[in-house]
Regions:
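N-terminal core-binding DNA-recognition domain of tyrosine site-specific recombinases/integrases
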Residues: 1-41, 46-48, 163-171, 188-193
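Bulky hydrophobic/aromatic "packing anchor" residues in well-ordered structure
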Residues: 11, 54-57, 80, 155-156, ...
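Basic, Lys/Arg- and aromatic-enriched nucleic-acid-binding interface segment
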Residues: 26, 30-34, 45, 49-104, ...
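Conserved tyrosine-mediated DNA breakage-rejoining catalytic core shared by Y-recombinases
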Residues: 56-59, 76, 100, 109-145
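Short, contiguous acidic/charged loop-to-helix segments that flank catalytic cores in large enzymes
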Residues: 85, 123-131, 158-167, 185-190
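Active-site/catalytic core of tyrosine-dependent DNA strand-transfer enzymes
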Residues: 137-186
């Protein structure tokens, strides 16, 4: 099949086939589709195809991996935050999640101007309830102030937006996963489960 002949229906059949034969976790399937969508976007810009059939593709429902998640233990947190493998952005994001319970997307979108009156002001989120204010813990204040610079508007510096929805968290989330794996943290310990480990 030539690339121009690939339709949205074929994309759907492909995703269904992966689910049936490999039964991947939802995140694994999502990342696979995002990678293919990126390839089609490249092909579209170079006029190899007339559209990207994977653009805003709705994933089929597969197995849920909620049971894989578990709160971070004190030892998990210590190993991660004291590791030489963890860069400054990973350290700051993890600290913010621990002290606030924020989602990774929210943390990646935080700007220095969103902090005033010792509060994080969150203006974007999945729901209206996501728009809220969260107290800035004194520990976080020291960490963020020490990382501040005049020419950087975001708290997490240098993140490159990616994925079909162009999120700053896309590549960063993958990096966090690779770091956890490198540290041999338990499989169920993921960034999202920091929301269940709030200090």
């Amino acid at each position: 099949v030539e690339i121009k002949e690939i339709t949205r229906r074929l994309c759907s059949d492909y995703a269904d086939s992966i689910l049936k034969n490999k039964d991947p976790a939802h995140g694994t399937l999502r990342n696979t589709i995002l990678d293919i969508s990126t390839l089609f976007s490249w092909a579209y810009r170079r006029e190899y195809t007339e559209s990207n059939p994977f653009y805003k593709f709705k994933l089929p429902v597969g197995r849920k991996n909620v049971q894989e998640r578990r709160p971070w233990s004190d030892e998990d947190i210590r190993r991660f935050l004291t590791s030489d493998f963890v860069n400054k952005n990973e350290f700051i994001a993890t600290a913010i999640a621990l002290y606030t319970g924020m989602r990774l997307d929210e943390i990646c979108m935080l700007k220095h101007k969103h902090i005033f009156e010792d509060l994080f002001h969150i203006f974007e989120g999945k729901t209206k309830a996501a728009r809220r204010v969260v107290p800035v813990h004194p520990v976080l204040k020291k960490i963020i102030v020490s990382n501040d610079s005049d020419n950087e508007e975001y708290i997490l510096k240098g993140l490159i937006s990616a994925g079909y929805d162009n999120k700053r968290s896309c590549n960063f989330q993958k990096r966090l996963g690779r770091t956890r794996k490198r540290l041999n943290l338990p499989k169920g310990v993921v960034f999202h489960s920091l929301r269940n480990t709030v200090i």
